[in-house]
């Protein structure tokens, strides 16, 4: 049921959200190469303040956060909170909740993370300029890839959608681990200790039945600030916060149905022509509303609340401030880093996902899902090369402002690799998927 719910969520918003994300990226590239590029750069470097007395929440190391840092380190924490909620749900009741369900997507994701690194290292070997960006082509953008898949409508078997979603979730886990382990420096353990104590506090408060989302989010902001000062990348705080958000509703579904039936049976009946509810009717409806709130777990409720803000505000903003590739410079635009990232996404992702899936099925480690064929698997493996969001994120962590030329190359590689993977994946699937006859 949970994966079907995920499909419904994505099918309703994924195409529009993916288009908005793409438009934001194109707008950034156009502006970065236009006469107003200095204004764009000034916007990215604009310093922010959120003063509470003498305390500035938006500061790090004694310096104010700039706009690009606020979006990458602040707003993207909300994105990673949503990713964490989705991962937790899939681990509890979804496609990663058992070995049988998780085996094939997990194996495919491992290949999809390993091969891009190998391809990247073959172009940018260890010790060379740009070698620190080897993790950039590891990730698959769930929203973008499912958005492309949604363009094919009912021709796509549900098993393919489930497979793509599941291995992309495992990819996200890999990306999060990479960020946590390899992009942290000068760790201040005092801040981490306080954050850990707050996580433990939230866990036990959730266990005692507290389900107030606002309370968890307010403490989450405090934890985010502690991570920001600690040296561990602040977005990790959002992922960990997701795992202490209660997944159990306050009201059991069976009791909810019984309560609703009882409430409806006692609903006061008035004259059919009346357009105004009585106080008694309003009271009964409020009982239904309250029960409906309590039957939805904080985890699912928060996940549902965040989808719109993340897909239509945060990710487009992220794309706008990070996808501004400067096209002047000729060879400097592509370079070894650009080639390595693009090749990693296009060839590494395809080869890793396809080969590891083929191997797992051939040695009978796991069966081929119904509806999957070797031909349509090739299309799904190509869509796995749509790395956009997390790839751009890791590119900024890898190079940042210290290596602007390499960062520009990495951005170009992410954009070109993502576009080529998405386009080829769509074409292959459009060719190999049967057209369903209308009844």
UniProtKB/Swiss-Prot annotation:
Localization per record: Cell inner membrane
Disulfide feature: none
GO molecular function term, any single one: sodium:proton antiporter activity
GO BP terms: regulation of pH
GO cellular component: plasma membrane
Its membrane topology: Multi-pass membrane protein
TM spans (from-to): 12-32, 67-87, 103-123, 133-153, 162-182, 186-206, 214-234, 314-334, 341-361, 379-399, 412-432
Pfam annotation, one family: Na_H_antiport_1
Record's keyword terms, sorted: Antiport, Cell inner membrane, Cell membrane, Ion transport, Membrane, Sodium, Sodium transport, Transmembrane, Transmembrane helix, Transport
Catalytic activity: Na(+)(in) + 2 H(+)(out) = Na(+)(out) + 2 H(+)(in)
NCBIfam families: NhaA
UniProt family annotation: Belongs to the NhaA Na(+)/H(+) (TC 2.A.33) antiporter family.
HAMAP family: NhaA
Functional summary from the UniProt entry: Na(+)/H(+) antiporter that extrudes sodium in exchange for external protons.
Name of the protein described by the UniProt record: Na(+)/H(+) antiporter NhaA
Organism, as annotated: Bacteroides thetaiotaomicron (strain ATCC 29148 / DSM 2079 / JCM 5827 / CCUG 10774 / NCTC 10582 / VPI-5482 / E50)
């Amino acid at each position: 049921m949970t994966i079907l719910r995920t499909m419904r969520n994505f099918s309703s918003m994924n195409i529009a959200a993916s288009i908005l994300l793409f438009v934001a990226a194109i707008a950034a590239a156009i502006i970065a190469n236009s006469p107003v590029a200095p204004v764009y750069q000034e916007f990215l470097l604009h310093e922010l303040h959120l003063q509470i007395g003498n305390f500035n929440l938006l500061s790090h190391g004694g310096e104010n956060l700039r706009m690009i840092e606020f979006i990458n380190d602040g707003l993207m924490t909300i994105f990673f909170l949503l990713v964490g909620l989705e991962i937790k749900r899939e681990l509890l009741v979804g496609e990663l909740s058992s070995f049988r369900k998780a085996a094939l997507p997990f194996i495919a994701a491992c290949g999809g993370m390993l091969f891009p690194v190998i391809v990247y290292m073959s172009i940018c070997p260890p010790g060379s300029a740009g070698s620190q960006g080897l993790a950039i082509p590891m990730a698959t953008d769930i929203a973008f890839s499912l958005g492309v898949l949604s363009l094919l409508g009912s021709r796509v078997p549900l098993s393919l959608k489930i497979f793509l979603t599941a291995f992309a979730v495992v990819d996200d886990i890999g990306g999060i681990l990479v960020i946590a382990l390899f992009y942290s420096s000068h760790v201040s353990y005092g801040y981490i200790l306080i954050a850990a104590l707050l996580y433990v506090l939230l866990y036990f408060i959730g266990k005692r039945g507290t389900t107030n989302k606002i309370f968890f989010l307010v403490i989450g902001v405090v934890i985010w600030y502690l991570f920001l000062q600690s040296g561990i990348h602040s977005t990790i705080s959002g992922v960990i916060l997701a795992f202490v958000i209660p997944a159990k509703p306050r009201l059991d579904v069976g009791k909810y149905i019984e309560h609703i039936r009882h409430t409806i049976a006692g609903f006061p009946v008035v004259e059919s022509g009346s357009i105004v509810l009585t106080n008694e009717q309003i009271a009964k409806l409020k009982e239904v509303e309250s029960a409906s709130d309590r039957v939805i777990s904080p985890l699912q409720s928060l996940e549902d609340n965040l989808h719109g803000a993340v897909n239509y505000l945060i990710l487009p903003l992220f794309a706008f401030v990070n996808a501004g590739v400067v096209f002047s410079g000729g060879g400097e635009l592509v370079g070894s880093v650009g080639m390595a990232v693009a090749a990693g996404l296009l060839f590494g992702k395809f080869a890793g996902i396809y080969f590891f899936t083929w191997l797992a099925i051939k040695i009978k480690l796991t069966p081929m899902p119904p509806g999957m064929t070797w031909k349509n698997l090739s299309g799904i493996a190509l869509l796995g090369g749509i790395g956009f969001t997390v790839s751009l994120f890791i590119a900024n962590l890898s190079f940042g402002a210290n290596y602007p030329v390499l960062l520009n190359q990495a951005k170009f590689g992410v954009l070109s690799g993502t576009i080529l993977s998405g386009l080829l994946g769509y074409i292959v699937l459009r060719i190999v998927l049967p057209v369903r006859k209308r009844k």
